[in-house]
Design a protein with these regions (language model features):
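Non-catalytic, conserved peripheral segments adjacent to functional cores
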Residues: 1-82, 86, 102, 108-136
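Histidine-centered metal-chelating micro-motifs
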Residues: 84-86, 90-95
């Protein structure tokens, strides 16, 4: 499945909002890990890497940020805001910039955490030279 960005349905009722993510419909892999980013200083950046094996689905639960994606044709910029979801397959360069002060995103991962970061390419020049063409 290629990179995808889409809005989730937001249900508003009696003073709150509910946003469901149906795993069977929105996540094309078995979820092995969930993590989230909160309390970022306004303007913070995170990510800026690709994975060799890991696939991820990101959900912007609150706030906004800029998603920087390279799916094989150079960097693209996407606004990522409350209620948006994004599927990032392996070998797609990704990161988030300009997080708002209230930004919170949740990530659903196909792999368990590995502290040695052997599944990462964090050098964009190396990514462009060696890995960009491997996108499924």
């Amino acid at each position: 499945m290629p990179f995808k960005l889409w809005p989730l349905k937001i249900w508003t009722n009696k003073g709150y909002s509910l946003t469901p993510l149906e795993l069977k419909d929105h996540v094309p892999f078995e979820v092995k890990r969930v993590y989230w980013v909160t309390q970022a200083a306004a303007g913070t950046s995170t990510g800026q890497h690709c994975h060799f094996d890991e696939q991820e689905v990101f959900v912007c639960a609150q706030g906004s940020m800029t998603a920087v994606i390279d799916r094989g044709n150079g960097k693209e910029i996407f606004e990522f805001k409350t209620g948006d979801a994004m599927y990032v397959p392996n070998f797609v360069w990704h990161g988030f910039e300009n997080l708002s002060a209230d930004a919170m995103f949740i990530a659903f991962s196909s792999t368990n955490y590995s502290a040695d970061r052997s599944d990462y390419c964090e050098d964009y020049e190396k990514y462009c030279a060696e890995y960009r063409g491997k996108i499924a």
